[in-house]
């Protein structure tokens, strides 16, 4: 995907600049990095809460309403990080929403699954997301695990999903719209929408242009007052939002390649603002570029829009992940495992071995502590000049993952009904 190529290039550029050490003036040395990290490197142990408490003991996570981790997709360990951090934040800091890099309609359908446990919903999503990074065994097993977790929570304490992406799979979006409207009676002028959606969802009948249904629906839902009286305000606004999001997808995929990332992240932020409730607290794992809190090379990531919002300017925390000797599942090659390595702060062995001592394959660096060199370092690993972006302007922690396998190819026979 376009964004993954961008991030890999950036990571390699950063590491090559960093790895030269003190060959150039104004560079930090390997010893500088080691001294900066030796007291700020923590083992991640999800089996004992005190390890996580120690990582964040000087942070006070109560101050944050949004915490985002930046991943490379389809690495198995991502789903361990996702579930365990979500559970920790939910149980200790009342984070009640999982903010996902998925379309609004998919979040709606997954919330239906979390309410019912109906595997047919997941099967429907699997069918239409095959050949994407989000159609792996771990991805759907995560939702099953979340469903079981929620069953042990009081109704009002259960975690729900918020999706902010555009509708990359319009057929799934139409299925969600039909789920909203199918039980409604006396729809008057909106009955034409129900007929259009029934033809597609139940009979498989569709025009050559997959977006034509959304265009027809758009003409039928212009009267919001009438729509809200027929469907109720919440359902009508969701129906309209999903339909608008389908049309946004058409606009996005019709854009020049160099405009794709710019437009997509702005569209995702606009969706988030519509869906946001200031009482919510969000945790999510997104593609790594999206969690940066400041523009890079003229590109504004999703999190940078949130950071610029006065309501969230000091309430968002970003955590990056670097992968050492890991594998990911490549959906373009039928989910074959391929190597991924994006070293960002990884020192020569004489120093790195000391940092990793007794820390296993999963540990985290705190970068934003008082008087940290990372608060003075530009994105190329050099001492920042006036006006340059600091590393900690982008993200404040860095997780190191070692030796993770790739996600598994989905088994379409498992859980099918």
Task: Please give the residue ranges for each predicted region.
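Hydrophobic h-region of N-terminal signal peptides that target proteins for export
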Residues: 10-19
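Structural recognition of the beta-strand scaffold that forms the well-ordered cores
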Residues: 67-68, 96-101, 160-163, 282-285, ...
């Amino acid at each position: 995907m376009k964004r993954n190529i961008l991030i890999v290039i950036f990571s390699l550029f950063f590491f090559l600049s960093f790895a030269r050490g003190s060959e150039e003036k104004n560079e930090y040395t390997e010893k500088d990095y080691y001294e900066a990290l030796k007291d700020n490197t923590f083992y991640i142990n999800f089996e004992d809460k005190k390890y996580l408490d120690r990582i964040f003991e000087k942070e006070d996570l109560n101050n944050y309403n949004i915490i985002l981790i930046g991943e490379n997709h389809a690495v198995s360990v991502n789903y361990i990080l996702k579930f365990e951090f979500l559970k920790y934040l939910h149980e200790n800091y009342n984070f009640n929403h999982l903010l996902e890099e998925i379309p609004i309609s998919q979040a709606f359908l997954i919330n239906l699954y979390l309410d019912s446990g109906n595997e047919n919903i997941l099967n429907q999503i699997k069918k239409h997301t095959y050949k994407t990074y989000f159609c792996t065994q771990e991805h759907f097993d995560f939702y099953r695990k979340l469903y079981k977790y929620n069953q042990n929570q009081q109704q009002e304490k259960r975690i729900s999903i918020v999706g902010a992406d555009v509708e990359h799979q319009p057929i799934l979006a139409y299925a969600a719209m039909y789920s909203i409207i199918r039980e409604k009676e006396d729809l008057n002028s909106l009955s034409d929408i129900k007929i259009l959606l029934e033809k597609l969802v139940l009979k498989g009948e569709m025009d050559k242009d997959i977006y034509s249904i959304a265009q027809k629906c758009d003409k039928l839902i212009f009267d919001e007052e009438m729509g809200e009286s027929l469907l109720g305000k919440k359902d009508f606004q969701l129906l309209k939002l999903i339909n608008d999001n389908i049309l946004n997808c058409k606009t996005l995929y019709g854009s020049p390649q160099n405009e794709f990332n710019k437009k997509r992240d702005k569209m995702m932020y606009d969706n988030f603002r519509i869906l946001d409730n200031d009482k919510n607290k969000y945790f999510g794992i997104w593609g790594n570029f999206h969690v940066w809190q400041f523009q890079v090379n003229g590109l504004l990531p999703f999190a940078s829009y949130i950071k610029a919002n006065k309501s969230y300017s000091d309430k968002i925390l970003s955590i990056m992940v670097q992968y050492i000797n890991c594998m990911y599942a490549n959906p373009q090659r039928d989910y074959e495992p391929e190597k991924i390595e994006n070293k960002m702060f990884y020192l020569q062995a004489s120093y790195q071995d000391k940092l990793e001592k007794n820390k296993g394959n999963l540990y985290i660096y705190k970068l934003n502590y008082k008087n940290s060199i990372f608060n003075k370092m530009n994105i190329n690993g050099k001492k920042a000049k006036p006006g340059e972006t600091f590393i900690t302007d982008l993200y404040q922690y860095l997780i190191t993952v070692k030796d993770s396998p790739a996600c598994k190819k989905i088994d379409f026979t498992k859980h099918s009904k």
